[in-house]
Each structure stands twice: as C-alpha cells, then as structure tokens.
Swiss-Prot record:
Pfam families: AA_kinase (PF00696), PUA (PF01472). This is Glutamate 5-kinase. InterPro entries: AceGlu_kinase-like_sf, Asp/Glu/Uridylate_kinase, G5K_ProB, Glu/AcGlu_kinase, Glu_5kinase, Glu_5kinase/COase_Synthase, Glutamate_5-kinase_CS, PUA. It comes from Streptomyces avermitilis (strain ATCC 31267 / DSM 46492 / JCM 5070 / NBRC 14893 / NCIMB 12804 / NRRL 8165 / MA-4680). One of its GO terms (molecular function) is ATP binding.
C-alpha cells in the first residue's frame, strides 16, 4: 500500500459524497438496495469507533420525481424545489431505516451557501456537525434545495461536499459516482486507462472530461467532481474519486479510483466558499492605489479607493473587485447595499462619518472577508 493510500486508510474524519445516480433505479426512484449497500459500508467503517463519517447525499429531487408524476428532473427551479420538498423526507426516511439496522442514528443537515459564507451561519453549521459526530450520529447533509435561489445555490453536491469537508476539518473526502475514477478517455471503450493519481492540473491536461449525469436524475458529472476534488485538494484535503460499488475498497485504502493529492493549505471556511463556489452579484472597480492596498498589502477596501460600482447586491453578498482595466483581482463580501455605494465613491471614511453618520465609517470589504484571485 502506498503512503497516500495508507493515509486514506488511517483517516479518522471522513466526508463521503454520493450522487443521485448511485442511489436510484433506472426509472429514477430511490433504490433501497443501493442505499442499504452504502450504509453497510459506512457502518462497517465506523464500527471500530475510530472513524467519524459525514455523508453528503444527493437524491432528494430524484426521490420526489415519481410521487409528483415527473418522469425526468425538471429544469426550472420551482419544480426542482417542489420535488426536493417531497423527496427529502423520503430520502432521510430511507437512510434512517437503513441505519437503524446498525443501531446508528441519522441527523439531517440542510445547508445553503450562507451557511458556509456568513460568520454566524458557518460557525453554527460547524458546531452542529461536530456535536452530531460526538454523539455518534451519522450526519446526512444536502443542499437546502427548497429555499436556495438560482443566485445562491451551490449548484451541485460535489462542491458542497468539498466545502463541508473543510468545514468539519476532514482528513479525507470520498466522492462516489457511477464511474470508477477519472479515465483518459471514454471508460466504456477499450484501450482507456484509469488515472490513478493526480498531483495537479498537469496530470489531467490530456483528459477529455464529460459533464452529463446519468438518466437525467442529477446535476453532477465528472466536471463537477474534478472541480470539487480541486477545491478540497487546494484546501489541504486528499480526495478519492471512485464508484459507489467500490466504496469499501476506497475507505480501506485500496488502489481504486483516482487519488487527488493535497496541493495547498487550509484556509477559513468562508473564504474557501468565496473563492471557489460563490457567484459574484456585482463588481467594484478600484483605483490603482486601492488595488495595491488590497493585493500587495492585504488591506481592507475603503470607499476612497472605489472608482465605480455595478450590479444589484445587498450587504453580505459576494462581489468581484476589479482593477482599472477590468481584470478581477479579488472577491469579497460587501458591507453595503449596491444603492448605498455611489455616494461613497472616492471619499474618506472620516468624511462619510461626519456627513452621513458613524455607521458609514467602515470598510466596504473587510480584509477578513476577502480572497485574492490567481492571475
């Protein structure tokens, strides 16, 4: 066993993500046998008492299709949310029944992007997951599809899993799919080879990656899984991407699937979301002095350094920070509504406090809520 795979076998806190295609029948409904098989693997891995597992599970929308008379996953958000509302209860009930066979309690955790970005939200989410693990429960995490909007959705549970792995300080992320890892071509065709290890983007430069999920029941394809692996690896978390039928081998550290080596160090949970999974709701154009302050000196963005504002956003939304030539240099959580900023442009905080009141004597984007973007 390689050192990397030995590290996988020795991981104590693990986030496992399973997609809709690994939990459903060909018709799109929940497959009880598949759910039971996955739970059996997770229960065995936990049985020694040394491992903690968080399960990020898709399948709520897929589970709600048949009860609502839908043949395929709808494209519009409203019907997706209706299906999720019906299906989430069915999904958790199935997990609860399956886990009960092993004496394991299930704790449902529904997250939105706010829960990994806003200070109070992500702190509470982290505490809840920590407490569930400490009490021996199996947290089952999903995006809260019924309340998320197009603008603030994670979009797929692969990215959510990467962010949850960072949120709970996991030692390992396992992404389960219906494909045994990354291949250098169509895995259904002869002559293609599995990519056993990925140290960086150069190892995937020759790989053509498809994006479609199976049977129209999910949103995730190989593109989103590789992106999730990249996010987690950049945060210092190793990743194994393999098929659900090889979940036991993956958790045991055997040579299955594709192993992504960590490429970076851990950062604040909110900043990981901000850099990799947020959708900017607007943009602020900075003058040259503000660009240097933000990029080179890692300072907060003050009103005096802003030359222009665009977009419609509210305080707490992610926005893009651009230089005078329109290049994105950073991303941050803004402290003001878009409609408030025009009156602040180019003015000092002292002047604003004197004219508008002390509430305006603050940063537009605080340095703790800001990430630099790679050129």
């Amino acid at each position: 066993m390689s050192a990397a795979r030995q590290g996988v076998a020795q991981a104590r806190r693990i986030v496992v993500k399973v997609g809709s295609s690994s939990l459903t029948t060909a018709a799109g409904g929940l497959d009880a046998d598949r759910v039971d098989a996955l739970v059996d693997v997770l229960a065995k891995s936990r049985s020694g008492g040394e491992k903690e597992i968080v399960l990020v599970s898709s399948g709520a929308i897929a589970a709600g299709l048949a009860p609502l008379g839908l043949r395929r996953r709808p494209k519009d958000l409203a019907r997706q949310q209706a299906a999720a509302s019906v299906g989430q209860g069915l999904l958790v009930a199935r997990y609860t029944a399956s886990c009960a066979r092993h004496g394991i309690r299930v704790g449902q955790v529904l997250l939105t992007s706010d829960d990994t970005s806003r200070r109070a939200h992500h702190r509470n989410a982290s505490r809840t997951l920590d407490k569930l693990l400490a009490m021996g429960a199996l947290p089952v995490v999903n995006e809260n599809d019924t309340v998320a909007t197009d603008e603030i959705r994670f979009g797929d549970n692969d990215r959510l899993a990467a962010l949850v792995a960072h949120l709970v300080r996991a030692d390992l992320l396992v992404l389960l799919s219906d494909v045994d890892g990354v291949y250098d071509g169509d895995p259904s065709k002869p002559g293609t080879s599995r990519v056993a290890q990925v140290h960086g983007p150069q190892d995937l430069a020759h790989v053509e990656i498809g994006s479609a999920g199976r049977a129209g029941v999910g949103t995730g394809g190989m593109v989103t899984k590789i992106e999730a692996a990249r996010i987690a690896a950049a945060a210092g978390i190793p990743v194994v991407l393999t098929s659900a039928v090889h979940a036991a081998d993956a958790l045991a550290g055997r040579d299955t699937g594709t192993y992504f080596h960590p490429t970076g160090k851990r950062s604040a949970d909110r900043l990981l979301w901000l850099q990799h999974a947020s959708t900017p709701q607007g943009a602020l154009t900075l003058d040259d002095g503000a660009v240097r302050a933000v990029v080179e000196r890692r300072k907060s963005l003050l009103p005096a350094g802003i030359a222009a504002v665009e977009g419609e956003f509210t305080a707490g939304d992610p926005v893009e920070l651009r230089d005078s030539e329109g290049r994105a240099v950073a991303r941050g959580l803004v402290s003001f509504d878009a409609k408030e900023i025009p009156q602040l442009l180019g003015r000092s905080t002292r002047e604003l406090a004197r004219e508008l009141g002390p509430a305006y004597e603050r940063e537009v984007v605080h340095r703790d809520d800001l990430v630099l973007l790679q050129p």
